[in-house]
């Protein structure tokens, strides 16, 4: 039970990095000697010291003969920072308990093997499902080359997203919109369509003022990382004056042809081929994976939502349901043309159901 207690602490520490570590994974480390925590830390940003280094610095000489609990296999390769294995070995740690092996081919068990070769008692697998859930985007990209895609939808009880006129502000409650801010902040990128930009002129930023007090305390406003905004714009309809281009952070456009207009330095273009007359979403996701994008939060209209679902690219649905009815003339949730049989419908299973103010939030994953 002691091992579980300390690993749970390491996982809690790792969660603190979920807004800032991209493209790196979230990692926490706790160092224990004689039943006392002598050092702890978590990875805060890519290029900065890893969790083990922070914990070892805190532990100092007390790390000798201690046990290190780490949520991810310590790295053994030289990246932007030195290998954590070397630091653990040099500190004289006697035992290392890792929650999960690193799926990164550069590590992939080599870290644990190196520690064993140095005479350290090594084990892994403790609370592995919790560690994998914390790094689902990193894991998906390492294993498949694709980012983890969360599709956010907001609807009425009868599955409608807007009135026939297009009026949609606001179907869901202020509490639901604040909840969205937190989930946006945890994402590496936010994806939308040119149709949504033209219709709503959204900023698609994380608004620090709408985050909960605990998150604000951990992350002062000046440390807030804005997710990369990605716009699918195959016809080059979005202009440099749209709000999404003017916000802090980067805006990427997925296009099928170059755009010759003058854009701010924070704008980047990805040229993607067409497939059946539309921008190829599968190729786009492959390209984003190559750009080390771990996770994508999608906020778009029914056309892009439906296209992602039909392409089998959605890993998780997050649906906010408001307790109101909009009627049969209102706009639907997703455009899924060509569905004739129930067997052809995209299938999901419920993962979590929670109340958010007066609304309900459904979390669903692929069946």
Swiss-Prot record:
Domain CMP/dCMP-type deaminase: 1-123
MF terms in GO: 5-amino-6-(5-phosphoribosylamino)uracil reductase activity; diaminohydroxyphosphoribosylaminopyrimidine deaminase activity; NADP binding; zinc ion binding
Pathway, per record: Cofactor biosynthesis; riboflavin biosynthesis; 5-amino-6-(D-ribitylamino)uracil from GTP: step 2/4; Cofactor biosynthesis; riboflavin biosynthesis; 5-amino-6-(D-ribitylamino)uracil from GTP: step 3/4
E.C. numbers: 3.5.4.26, 1.1.1.193
Reactions that this protein is recorded to catalyse: 2,5-diamino-6-hydroxy-4-(5-phosphoribosylamino)-pyrimidine + H2O + H(+) = 5-amino-6-(5-phospho-D-ribosylamino)uracil + NH4(+); 5-amino-6-(5-phospho-D-ribitylamino)uracil + NADP(+) = 5-amino-6-(5-phospho-D-ribosylamino)uracil + NADPH + H(+)
Family: In the N-terminal section; belongs to the cytidine and deoxycytidylate deaminase family. In the C-terminal section; belongs to the HTP reductase family.
Protein name from the UniProt record: Riboflavin biosynthesis protein RibD
């Amino acid at each position: 039970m002691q091992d579980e207690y300390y690993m749970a602490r390491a996982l809690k520490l790792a969660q603190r990095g979920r807004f800032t570590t991209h493209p790196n994974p979230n990692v926490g480390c706790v160092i224990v000697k004689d039943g006392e925590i002598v050092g702890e830390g978590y990875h805060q940003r890519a290029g900065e010291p890893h969790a083990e280094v922070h914990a070892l610095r805190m532990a100092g000489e007390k790390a000798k003969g201690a046990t290190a609990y780490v949520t991810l296999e310590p790295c053994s390769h030289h990246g932007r920072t030195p290998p954590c294995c070397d630091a653990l070995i040099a500190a004289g740690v006697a035992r290392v308990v890792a929650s999960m092996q690193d799926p990164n081919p550069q590590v992939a068990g080599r870290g644990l093997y190196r520690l064993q070769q140095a005479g350290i008692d090594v084990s892994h697998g403790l609370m592995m499902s919790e560690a994998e859930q914390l790094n689902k985007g990193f894991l998906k990209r390492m294993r498949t080359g694709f980012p983890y895609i969360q599709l956010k939808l907001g609807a009425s009880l009868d599955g409608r997203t807007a009135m026939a006129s297009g009026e949609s502000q606001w179907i869901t409650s202020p509490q639901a919109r604040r909840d969205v801010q937190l989930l946006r902040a945890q994402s590496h990128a936010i994806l939308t369509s040119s149709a949504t930009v033209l219709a709503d002129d959204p900023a698609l930023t994380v608004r620090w003022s709408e985050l909960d007090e605990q998150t604000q305390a951990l992350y002062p406003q000046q440390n807030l990382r804005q997710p990369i905004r990605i716009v699918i714009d195959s016809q080059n309809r979005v202009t440099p004056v749209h709000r999404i281009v003017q916000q802090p952070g980067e805006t990427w456009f997925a296009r099928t042809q170059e755009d010759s207009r003058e854009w701010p330095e924070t704008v980047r273009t990805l040229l993607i081929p067409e497939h059946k007359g539309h921008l190829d979403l599968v190729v786009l996701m492959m390209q984003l994976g190559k750009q080390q994008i771990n996770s994508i939060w999608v906020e778009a209209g029914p056309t892009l939502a439906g296209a992602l679902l039909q392409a089998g690219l959605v890993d998780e649905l997050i649906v906010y349901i408001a307790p109101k009815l909009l009627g049969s003339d209102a706009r639907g949730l997703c455009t899924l043309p060509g569905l004739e049989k129930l067997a052809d419908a995209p299938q999901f299973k419920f993962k979590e159901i929670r109340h958010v103010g007066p609304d309900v939030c459904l979390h669903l994953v692929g069946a």
